[in-house]
């Protein structure tokens, strides 16, 4: 079987299983199986697919058809033009979270705290894009292992701390606190795609029945590690409800994404 034929058959299997973006997914999985990029696939379309490549490709196709996210199969996800390692222990970084990174970069903070770092995508990106001192926390030891791996692989200097929110950190030591907390409402669970609902870590997705449980803790807790005049930035689910929680903060603003959806809340510590 040639590379071209394998790619076509993979696409057809994925389409039959109603997997979205079947062609792209087949390409990504075949690239993973053979260890070459997309340009190689098309330059060597008439090459015979060796047996070990076909075995790997077949296994990856089966995993995807069974609902495993492509990113967990390949172990990779691009974020802010860099490739991050991801596993089922961490949430898959989304493109919309780059709006949070952009908002943080615009502040030029000297010391940044990322609460609930997960894969480390936000913290590592901020460390690489700035000269800031970056600290990141997470309660999950498995997530911290992935985050440390990503920092090391990408050459970022980030201090990782195992704790709940910012509990283990010194008061008033940061100019900026960023967070992408779990904000999917438990009542909306059934509306999620199965590959998200059933495969990504629930603790990183769901913020209680109304999606606001972590915000209720995070908004008051973020005051402590922030210096006076420091900034809190959070990715949003329910913008109106979270804005109301920040009534005691100054300079509250909402940043919309390109689709006009409220995506980031910014608030200044008095």
PLM-predicted stretches and their roles:
Residues 1-41, 46:
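Non-catalytic accessory regions of SAM-dependent methyltransferases
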Residues 183-214:
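Mobile active-site "lid"/loop adjacent to the S-adenosyl-L-methionine
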Residues 84, 158-160, 252:
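Generic structural signal for residues in well-ordered beta-strands
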Residues 28-106:
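Conserved AdoMet
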Residues 126, 196, 218-222:
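Class I S-adenosylmethionine-dependent transferase superfamily signal
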Residues 209-268:
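Conserved Class I SAM-dependent methyltransferase catalytic core
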